[in-house]
Amino acid sequence: MRLAASSLLLGAAASLLSSATALAVRSDNPGSSAGYFVRSLPGQPPGPLIKMHAGHIEVDHATNGNLFFWHFQNKHIANRQRTVIWLNGGPGCSSMDGALMEVGPYRLKDDHTLAENEGSWHEFANLLFVDQPVGTGFSYVNTDSYLTELTQMSDHFIKFLTKFFELFPEYESDDIYLSGESYAGQHIPYIADAILKRNADASIKWNVKGLLIGNGWIDPSNQYLSYLPFAYESGIVEKGSPIADQIEKQVAVCVKTIAEKGRHHVDLNQCEQILQDILAKTKHHKDGKEVCWNMYDVRLEDTYPSCGMNWPPDLSSLTPYLRRKDVLQALHVNPDKTAGWTECAGAVSSSFRALKSKPSVELLPDLLKEMPILLFSGNKDLICNHIGTEELIHNMEWNGGKGFELDGAPGTWAPREDWVFEDEPAGIYQSARNLTYVLIYNSSHMVPFDFSRRTRDMLDRFMEVDIGKIGGTPADSVIGGEKAPITSVGGTPNSTAAVEKEKERVDQARWAAYYRSGEVALVLVASAAAIWGIFIWRQRHRRRGRRGSYAGLGGLKMTGGSRDRLADGRESFDEDELRDLTVASPMFERDRDLEAAEARRYSLGGVSDDESDDEGRIEKRPSVG
């Protein structure tokens, strides 16, 4: 009997040590969340790094389809946990534009130096950037397997999110906001619709709370026909001129095509030609070069036929930075599976014509029954201009009314309210029946590039952030003559309640991470050591022929207690058989130090250059044209 008990103890210790070794190995590969942890970032600003994860997630084994993501943890804890997913357009343009030129925590000062972005959207929300469809940016797929339709894209995205939440279950119960710009105006509604369908049969629902689409390509039939009116409004084309007459003829061809083929198309070549004609017929010579208007910011010019493809200026730093070997290693990019980073993948765009897909505007009425949607437009963008967005709203029927009619008052339109940000006219707000439209002054196709702090104020208001208990200095934002709710702070969380909530979340996330990462190996090793110690003590005790107490175990202290569970009920590893055994050892002292360091890192965020010199900088990119 004694031999059996001794064998059992030895077997348990060996089993625990074996498990610890296996877990330690798994913690360093991409199959665990620890394998995605970004420990350092080349060119990072001074001070501790924001907590982030990055890498690939497989969405289609048969075609070698993998999507790349980059996730940043929030800076402040607000009244609820939120995750904002950001997608750039194209199709085929990388969301690293959004991460490093628009709403992410960092901006590039040059090709090797990062600066903090004062207007980063991670202030009150976790940020998740995804390169999609497959083949975009750092994502990859077999070259004969590029996607062609919007439903294929949304299916891949559901698979991506499923695996992402398996790796990071602490974020699955967050309020989710889907955001992006340009051709993401097609992607975002399709993804939202797919999530709602998935939720119908899922035990754990994904809480999609809203959509934000900037300068979105949503309703092609209305937006194609907005090109010439915008060219008139902005002075690019003079109404009644010979150039105008030529372009009007192409508009007539487009109108005829829509009448014949119907409005249920995402891509019509005859209508695409309108924009090409505007750019080609208004080109001129300047300083010995042939130049044209920048289609993303009509305040600017570019060499023909680029017409904006050389902008924004940050792109000249972004491309070499994202091709650096140390950056690829830091972000866990698979160097064998992807070519050097390019902003927009021509092969993806050429394949993704969505010829069998209906335009996303047809999904909006049903989505507006389930969630609020915000459409925002920079007023200097030509390719996805504000006139087209306003026309699609005016012609759309949703929630019992048409356009911005007020509830119960047909024919009465919601007022346009002036938005003043820090004593400067910032734009116009208009809302009705779950839809909000924001026109943003002096901004391009890439609004957050121009005014990141203003767009964050817009985001935080849309998410109904309540920071009353956090403290800090609020932004000065006024809508319709009334002070807007406090939605922005400076500094770090400074109230007792905020600190306690922060500590609680860090503790919960830490214990969840224990199981998913190799750190659980520390507990198992310590437990195995304790069992081994018990075995040695019992052997000595039997040899001495007398009773003893556990207090005599060299340096090992036994205490009662069990681990806390995550608030959402997910279990960490089972401790029923070890609940009376906790080891006080240098490993646990190290864990306390790590916890303190993690708590400090959790509160850090970004700050960047002042917006006053941002005017004139613009984004790329739909390849919508």
Swiss-Prot record:
Subcellular location: Golgi apparatus, trans-Golgi network membrane
Claim: RNA-binding is one of the keywords in the record: no
Keyword Aminoacyl-tRNA synthetase applies: no
GO molecular function, one term: serine-type carboxypeptidase activity
The protein's Enzyme Commission number: 3.4.16.6
Region Disordered: start-end pairs: 601-625
Catalyzed reactions: Preferential release of a C-terminal arginine or lysine residue
Keywords: Apoptosis, Carboxypeptidase, Glycoprotein, Golgi apparatus, Hydrolase, Membrane, Protease, Signal, Transmembrane, Transmembrane helix
Topological region Lumenal: 25-516
Family of this protein: Belongs to the peptidase S10 family.
Official protein name in the record: Pheromone-processing carboxypeptidase KEX1
Provenance organism: Tuber melanosporum (strain Mel28)
UniProt lineage: Eukaryota, Fungi, Dikarya, Ascomycota, Pezizomycotina
